[in-house]
Structure formats: structure tokens, C-alpha cells
């Protein structure tokens, strides 16, 4: 095994160098995460996707890369990507075995636009992006859970809004900033909101944060965004300049190659996994549009006149065209529109809204007069329903002339509004509406679940979805075949996000499985005041401006995609293979195929991976398992493992050295623990600790034959002697642990591992010194408490029946040397004692249960007592109630026992208000447990114990029953040997 010094030194090259390009496309810690075209989403909390692992290896304690802009589309898991990076630093800060150079961060600071986003971020950290470490200890609480989670998360993460963070920075001196924020990791969520602004206050926020990032010499920065530019290409300059040590200028945008060189190593680009189903933009190109297709509808004279007045009002008020936009959607028969029209023509009801009766028939019969857009839409929705196509309609307007009014128009045309209580077993023409004002999150999720159900393929449950901006994040629709965009936006990025709700990866799998041929048709509605003057349209005007902006933005986005450090690694995922999209927005208005700036071929260089990452990789654990399994069977050499596993010699030695140096237990057998040992290049399992520095004559053929033949090496002693010696060593170890126990649970953990004769020894000595003031009286009392079911003292006599095959008795329990096997008559007396004790437990028991404990298995059972006061005697006398494991009882019975009968007090920090008490009273699941005479304390107990898991309820019951001497010995508890 010949190694050079550089084999043990990790190496990363600086960005913007040819060596960096080689590193990114060849180092195994990066290239092993090359993305396939499709990838399954994680099923368990803390599981990461490939691109998330890649970024966490790029911005990492061991790398010198200090700032990356993540241009990752919506749905790629940007939050979890940043958390994966942060958790690597947290893990490294607490690692005691780190041997290579690394960056330790003092703080992890998450910056968001508003406080609401912070709550989402905390929730993602605790429940989605990590394996549960921030939820530990919370399973027993139902109140203040979010507050407790946030407290746990804030141990490692600090949260601030852009505004508050900038204001605090403005109050700090330069030295204070350095002292506070040097060696910090900054995560900036929705970073496109942080930019130079015409508003002085917004501009100051950007400047303060920019100055801090450039003041710090050692910092790591992650900027998260799915839309780095919304209105102008120049917005990207502000973003990159937050992380670049050498700033960009606007002129760089006109020099693509120079721009790409300057951002090299500082940007990652990733498309979402989107559906590759056929989609068709309906309509035609109008006005100055060269790429966007729109679906034009011409207003009738009445609507057109009102629209012209609304437009003039907007021009006069120099407003944001709200009047024009509302009136182009719909005007009411009285000539009103928007907020005024809504209040004058739509009435509130207990379940929502309704149209005034006097306008219902007019709108049903002459809708095109008042809304060309809605009349055309409803005609198309009727065809969709008839032909079994699911449809999705979007408008950013809810009230006014928006979605609520549209829903009422649908009802005039035979639709029924779907609610969570709808009878979906009966097919019906239904629509569902999702807005902040018409449905809660829970209701929205229920209805989307019904809509996405494979049984709703042709609209049997719900045929049409009406959605506002509330559905932009977190919701996806399946099997949509028609999408209708009723209101445009000044930039197209938001419109594209809306369309993507119905075009996700796998969103149309149910249609494919049923061999239904389909395409997704997309309609961008524009209302024209007059077909001869298409420019007279606020809708068309907005699309023209959006396209003009989008052409420039997408050109810069193509540069970013080509310059991304992970361009080659993500190319399969990012490339759209359907040639029909060439020249469209989907491919940045260019060819869908593209070349990366970094042209280095993908390779696999393990120089850093084996040093920094191998020990935390799945391959390491698999190799370790193989080595342990081999050692359990026979001795082995390194060469044998290399040949068998195809791992490198370095990797095999890494595992072996870890097992040797840290004396890790390979496996346990009755004679003790086994460790890995070696003599030169021969490795074997042994429960004898070998001194690695001691010389052994490994050339002795007899010794070598012995090593090869036997897994474990012993010298000069019989197997029986060695087993006895090792058992003695282990027993000493257990007894030491018992005498260091801090509580009864800890003592029981080690006590059950002792042979029964040693348990008897400890119990008999504890009985003999029960009245003495000894050093370990705390342990003595725990031993007596642990075995209280298995002894009785009748001063001066005492009896122990811990071992069912050998009872112990003494005529003078104060003398520890007088314990002897019981005589037959004493054994009979003990059986009477046990029976009498059980009878007392039944007769004095007001709880309806008795506890059974199996000492051999530590199983705890509950037996329901029978009798006239507790339950009727069974008519079939052959059936006997023998009890069952506590965990097998219904939770409601255990809650009733602990809360209502034992009346165990809840934890001190369990908050409970009068409002909570009313909730408990009215909750159907507490119906059998709540009685009229219960006060707030009773209800608090009930709520608390209902929030606990069954294991905790059983532990509490055992503790309470043991304290009240309501537990009896039963060797059949928890076994299949019950007498029935």
C-alpha cells in the first residue's frame, strides 16, 4: 500500500479557472449527483434529491466556494436545498473527529421578505428537510407545538426580514458588523425581492446588506430564487453583485462571454421536472405579439361603452388600470363593474354569495352583452364537460368582476358549487373555487384531492377549477386538458407559474394509463373593445409589454443556464427534447439544445470524496456491513475484500482503520463483545483486546492455520474458561452500571441483562440492608422497588420468588448469609401469599384493571377485572379473561384509565384554556369519556393524555399500578402460552 502525501489532502481550485471547471465535472462528490431526466421525489422527511446533495457538497465546510445564486424553478425544493447546506455546517461544528481543513460558521442567518415566509421556512426545516431532530420531545404536546418547534430550530438558525436586518445593520459600527457576522452562512429566500430600488427605503435595505456581504472576509451566501428577473434584465446585476467580489456592470449584459466568465462558479440553474405532454397555445398573434398567442373575444356594444368610460377614468386618474381590467372582464346590467358592481348586484349568504334575483334571468339569457370573455369561456367549459375534459380557470380578481361572479354565472348554467361535504358518489356538473376569501387551506386541499382522484378523470366529481393567486404555491392539478387565463400580468413569469400548476411531472399519468389521447390547450383571453381596433384592449396591451420584457429576460436566463457551474451535471434535466418548442419561451426563444460554457467531460475523481465524504456515504455503511459479516465467519485480508466488493484499497482501509482505532463492536455473543483485531494483514473478530503495537510471530504456520480456521482467537485456555471469564467481565460491567443508575428505568435496563441468580443476589442483599444507612441506599431502594412483586417480609422471616424454579427463604433477613432454598412447605406458603396478594388487588381495586408483569420478557399486561361491580360475569364459564399486553388495548381505554380513573396530573408546561375545554367537550372522539360534572382540570387531564402515544400511556400506568401495588407476577403475560 503505497500512498503519497496528496492522497490525504483535499484540494479544490478557485472559481473562474480551468482547474475549477475540471473539478466540477470530475470530482466524485459532484459528478455522482449528475441528474437523470426524471427522479422520484423523496418519500421521507430528511431525504434529499440529487441536486440538493450536489449543492450541499459545493457550498460546504470543506470547499472554498463562498457564494451561489440558486436559479431553481418553483417545485425544485429550494428551501430544502439551503437547509441541506446549513445542516452540513451544523454537523461539522459539532463533529469531534474532523481531521481536514474546514470552515466553521458561527451563525446561520435566514433572511426573508416578510415574517410569514419565516414560518413556512421553519415548518420546512422541521417537518420536511430534516429527519426529525427538531421535533424530538414534541410528540407529547398538542398546544404551542409550533412555538416549541421554532424554539428548537432557532438553536441553530436565526431569522430576520430584509427590513429589520438592514435597520439593525444601520445602527452598528464596522467593527461590530465584523465581530457579529464574520464566519456566517447567509440564506436569502426569494432573493429577487432584494435589489436597488427607486424607493429610497428599499434602496437602503439593499445597500446595507450589500455593504455587509462585501465587508466580511469569510462568509457563505446562498441566494434562492425561481425568478431572478421579473421586469428588467438589469435586475440580475443587483443579485449577482451581492455575492461577487468583483461586481458586474450593466455593460456586461451586452457581452455574453464576459458576463458568463464573471459569474462562473457563482450560479446554479435547474428547471423543474415538468410534464412532456403535448400542449397547444390556442388563439393567434395580435398587435405587436410575435410569440404569445392570445384568444380574442370582442365586447358587445354595451360592455364596450362601459369599458371606454372605465379606460378614460384610468387615464384621468393615472391609475394602474384597475377600472379597465375589471370592466373588460364583466359589467353588470346596471352598468357597474368591479367593487361597485359587486356590492350592488351580489348578496352575501350563509354559504357564500348569490346574484340579486332581478338580474339572474338577464345574465343567463344575455351574458355575451355584459361579458364577452365569460360567455365564450362558459361555452368552452360546457364542451369540455361534454367531452370529458377537466378544466382550470385563473383570474387574479376574486370579488368585483372576478371569480365569485364567474362562479355564480356557472350556477346559472347548470353547475353546482363543490364543497367538502358534497356527495361525490353521485356524478354531477360541479365547479370548485379556490381563493383566500372563499375557502380555507383545509377545504382547498380536500377539494383538490377529489379533483385529482383517478375516478374524476372525466369530471364526474368536479369538472372545473376556478383559482386565484392563492393556488400559485403548493398546489398541483392532475389530468387538466384545458387552461384558461382570464387576467394577464405585466410580466409573464407569474403567468407561467400559474400554467405550471396543471403541467407537472406525472400530472397526466392517469390519462395515459387509461389510453386516453389528449393535449393540454392553453387559452390567454384578451377582450377587445372593437374588432377593428385590437389596440383598444388593456389585456392585449399587458401581454405586449410582458412579451417585450420576457424576450430580454429569457436571453439573460439562457446565459445563466449555460454558465451555471452545474450546467453539464444538470443538462439532461434542463434540456427540453421536444423540438416543437424550439424558438418558444420554454427554450428562452432559442433552440432547445444548448452548450455549456464548461465543456470538460464528466469524470470520476475520488481524491476528495474518499477523504471527506466516503465515511458518510451509503457505500461506507454497506462496505462496513460486508467486512463485519466476513469477520463473523472467518479471518480475511484486505486484498480479499477489495476483490469481493470492488472497492478501492483506500476505501477498505478507511473502514478497517475506523473499526480498529475506535474499538467498534462488530457483534455480540453470549460470551461478550467482539471487536476487529489484526496481525499484520490478517484481520479477524476477537473478544480479546489485542495490543496493536505488540509483536506477534505471524510467520508461525501453526498460528496462521489456527487464525484461518477459527473466527475468534484464544491462547492457552479452554472455551469454557474463556466464556466464564468474559461473562464475569461483562457481569462486573453490568453491576457497575446498575450502581450508577440515576433512575428506575435505567436500572431496569441493565438489571434484566443479569442472570437470574445475580438478580436474586442483589435483591436478597438489598432486603438484608433495607433498614441500614448505607452509601448506596438510593440504588438499594430502587432494587427493592423494582422487585416489590417478588418478595415478602414477615419479620424476621423473608421470602423471594424471583426464580420460579428456586424460591429463596430466610429465618433472619437481616443476616445476608442465611438465605437458602425454600422447603416444600415454605414454597406452599409462598403460593398462598401470591394468591392472597392477587385477591387483595382485586377486592381493593377501584380502577377495573389489574397489572400483570412478566419478569423474563419485561412485558406489562392489563387484565380487566370481572364481577358485579365492574363487569358482568361471562355466561360461558370456559372463557377466562387472561389479560393482554398494554399496547394492545384501545387507546380510548388507556386514556380513560390514566386521565379519569388514576387522575395522573399533566406536565406543568401543558397550556389549557377555557376555550380548549369547550373544544374537548364538543369533540365527538371524547364523547364516551366526558361527563357533565367534569371541571376544567378534568378536561385538561383528558386532553393531555389523549395527546400522548400508547407507549407513554403504558409506562405511566405501570408506574402508577406499581406504586399502588396493583401489579402481580404473570409468566404468561406477553406470550402465546395463555390458558383459555
From Swiss-Prot:
Extent of the signal sequence: none
Tree of life domain: Viruses
Keyword Zinc (UniProt): no
Any GO molecular function: helicase activity
Residues that bind ATP: 72-79
InterPro entries: DNA/RNA_helicase_DEAH_CS (IPR002464), Helicase_ATP-bd (IPR014001), P-loop_NTPase (IPR027417), SNF2_N (IPR000330), SNF2_RAD54_helicase_repair (IPR050496)
Family affiliation: Belongs to the IIV-6 022L family. SNF2/RAD54 helicase subfamily.
Protein name, per record: Putative helicase 087L
Lineage: Viruses, Varidnaviria, Bamfordvirae, Nucleocytoviricota, Megaviricetes
